């Protein structure tokens, strides 16, 4: 998994940067690894908090609050969906007004507050319903947590989502601001920073699902969440203490404003007549993006009403809320061109979300003994993270060099082909999950036997392998194909696919629960048919894959693509191709 700045364009040199006093930065005292290293702590802590909560929350909701499996899954996926969606808000606020430093600092403080509230919510006994004994649980007589008891939990979760979204969308961009890309030495350091950035995420995630989940299950939720809160508080303090060491950049405005403005003006002028020739559109002669006939309705945003009055026309052109330029209109068209691929990426994250909900609950109905040690249900997700790390390494050392020789392309296979491979892995994961769940249920119902929870490893492995391809492919696709002046929204588009994936999971669970009269997704999985739900995801995944292929084969890649490859010794190789393959070629997928 490779992480890229959420908010920077094609080139950001140190000449645009300033220190905390507003003066040109001294490279020997600001930025570089000195500043970036302090910033990494914020992302490390965010991962510890979010992964420690999301990967084990469903067991608390079902086991302690006596909430149904379907409702518990919906709570978790809505939380994760909101967190990623609020990443768009965090990116917008940073780009439009606050800047990345202020946004990360505020978000870290908000996240710390949210985890403190969660610690309180899970520690106070009055925030939980009465303990349910085995007899009541067997006969579905457990008292479910009421609205009053859930209120503080919801406030805590969505406070964390608000803060986590702000960190997620800005911390990598703020880290990259510490390097001057016009300096070859610092540009190389920035690429190395992204490697270390991902390493921090991996370390934080593994610590959360192994150590914190164990503490939550065996010592107490309060202790587990308390450690997360303390970690976030320390990270916020360290971030603030390093203020004098950072390089800052002024907000340049959000590209979402441009998209909204073009859409608004096109609608406002919808009754206007098209000019006799596109050259009469505002800014046609100075456009940096060639005019196209695609989505011609948007061209109306660039129609000037005062062609006969040069002074009035000049006034209009200075106010972007009166008339847009051809460049702005064409940039919005390029973004709209990405929507079909964006939409067909959503279901991958819907499948991924099952690893944080029903797969964790499956583990609670299986034999988790490892000798005398009982592995916490949420800790099995460590296999997901380890698989992602494994395949990321294999991609760099084996897969990319091999496919380069086979396809004669600098990056091995195209970004859309990477996404396609990830989608196939996700379908395979759900098919395997369905088979394993059927075997688990039959053993429990017919033989009163629990099969080993390590049978869940294959589905974690397949989803992890899929993420290694799909994550990189999606992020690479949006970064490459977004307009040059709208690169800052690349991560925003990517985060929105993750967000929508979790929300679609919530919607799907609700629909299935209603259509099947709650027979597929019961709290007692031995009386449920979770395997049917997994097979449904396989079918939906197959249909989505076919639609993806249709759109991918029609997609035309942008010209003049720069490929950046980080080798094992952290050296940087750049390769430029005049034109990517213009379509998604099935024959190139290994």
Curated annotation (Swiss-Prot):
The ranges of region (Disordered) come to: 1-24
Q: Where are the transmembrane segments?
A: 48-68, 73-93, 104-124, 147-167, 197-217, 222-242, 332-352, 371-391, 419-439, 453-473, 492-512, 533-553
Keywords carried by this UniProt record: Membrane, Nitrate assimilation, Symport, Transmembrane, Transmembrane helix, Transport
Stimuli inducing this protein: Up-regulated in the shoots by nitrate, but down-regulated in the roots.
Q: Which domain of life is it from?
A: Eukaryota
> Which GO terms fall under molecular function for this chain's record?
symporter activity
Q: Where in the cell is it found?
A: Membrane
| Major location category of this protein | membrane
Q: Which GO terms describe its biological process?
A: nitrate assimilation
Q: Which tissues show it?
A: Expressed in leaves, flowers and siliques. Detected in leaves.
Which GO cellular component does the record give, naming just one?
A: membrane
Q: Which Pfam families match?
A: PTR2
Q: How does it sit in the membrane?
A: Multi-pass membrane protein
Q: Which SUPFAM superfamilies match?
A: MFS general substrate transporter (SSF103473)
Q: Which InterPro entries match?
A: MFS_trans_sf, POT_fam
The Swiss-Prot or TrEMBL record describes its family as follows:
Belongs to the major facilitator superfamily. Proton-dependent oligopeptide transporter (POT/PTR) (TC 2.A.17) family.
State the protein's purpose: Low-affinity nitrate transporter.
Official protein name in the record? Protein NRT1/ PTR FAMILY 6.4
Taxonomic placement: Eukaryota, Viridiplantae, Streptophyta, Embryophyta, Tracheophyta
């Amino acid at each position: 998994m490779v992480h890229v700045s959420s908010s920077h364009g094609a080139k950001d040199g140190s000449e645009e940067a300033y220190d905390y006093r507003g003066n040109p930065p001294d490279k020997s005292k600001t930025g570089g690894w000195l500043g970036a290293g302090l910033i990494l702590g914020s992302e490390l802590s965010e991962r510890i908090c979010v992964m420690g909560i999301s990967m084990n929350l469903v067991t608390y909701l079902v086991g302690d609050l006596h909430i149904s499996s379907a409702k518990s899954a919906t709570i978790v996926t809505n939380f994760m969906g909101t967190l990623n969606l609020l990443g768009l808000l965090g990116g917008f606020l940073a780009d439009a007004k606050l800047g990345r430093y202020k946004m990360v600092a505020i978000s870290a403080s908000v996240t710390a507050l949210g985890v403190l509230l969660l610690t309180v919510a899970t520690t106070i006994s009055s925030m939980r319903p009465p303990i349910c004994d085995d007899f009541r649980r067997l006969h579905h007589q457990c008292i479910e947590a009421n609205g009053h008891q859930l209120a503080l939990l919801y406030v805590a979760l969505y406070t964390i989502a608000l803060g986590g979204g702000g960190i997620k969308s800005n911390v990598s961009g703020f880290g990259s601001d510490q390097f001057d890309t016009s300096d070859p030495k610092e540009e190389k350091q920035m690429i190395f920073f992204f490697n270390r950035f991902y390493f921090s995420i991996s370390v934080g995630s593994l610590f959360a699902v192994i150590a914190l989940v164990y503490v939550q299950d065996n010592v107490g939720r309060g202790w587990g969440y308390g450690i997360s809160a303390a970690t976030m508080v320390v990270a916020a303090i360290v971030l603030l203490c390093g203020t004098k060491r950072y390089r800052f950049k002024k907000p340049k405005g959000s590209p979402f404003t441009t998209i909204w403005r073009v859409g608004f003006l096109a609608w406002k002028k919808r009754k206007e007549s098209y000019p006799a020739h596109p050259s009469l559109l505002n800014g046609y002669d100075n456009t940096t993006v060639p005019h196209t006939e695609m989505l011609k309705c948007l061209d109306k945003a660039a129609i000037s009403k005062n062609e006969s009055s040069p002074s009035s026309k000049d006034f209009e052109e200075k106010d972007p809320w009166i008339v847009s330029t051809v460049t702005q209109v064409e940039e919005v068209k390029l973004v709209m061109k990405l929507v079909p691929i964006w939409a067909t990426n959503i279901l991958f994250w819907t499948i991924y979300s099952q690893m944080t909900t029903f797969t964790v609950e499956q583990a609670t109905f299986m034999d988790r003994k490892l000798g005398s040690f009982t592995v916490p249900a949420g800790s099995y997700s460590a296999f997901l993270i380890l698989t992602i790390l494994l395949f990321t390494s294999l991609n760099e050392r084996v897969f990319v060099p091999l496919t380069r020789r086979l396809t004669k392309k600098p990056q091995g296979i195209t970004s859309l082909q990477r996404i396609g491979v990830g989608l196939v892995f996700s379908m395979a994961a759900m098919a395997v999950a369905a088979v394993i769940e059927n075997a688990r249920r039959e053993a429990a119902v017919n033989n009163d036997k629990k099969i080993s929870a390590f049978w869940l490893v294959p589905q974690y492995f397949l989803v992890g392998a899929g993420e290694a391809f799909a994550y990189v492919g999606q992020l690479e696709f949006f970064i490459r194909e977004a307009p040059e002046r709208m690169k800052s929204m690349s991560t925003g588009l990517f985060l929105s696919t993750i967000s929508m994936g979790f929300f679609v999971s919530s919607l799907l669970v609700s629909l299935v629960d209603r259509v099947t009269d709650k027979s597929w997704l019961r709290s007692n999985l031995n009386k449920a048919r979770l395997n049917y739900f997994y097979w449904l995801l396989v079918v939906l995944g197959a249909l989505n894959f076919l639609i993806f292929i249709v759109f991918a084969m029609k997609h035309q890649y942008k010209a003049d693509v720069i490929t950046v490859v980080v080798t094992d010794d952290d050296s940087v190789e750049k390769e430029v191709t005049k034109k990517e393959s213009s379509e998604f070629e099935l024959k190139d997928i290994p």
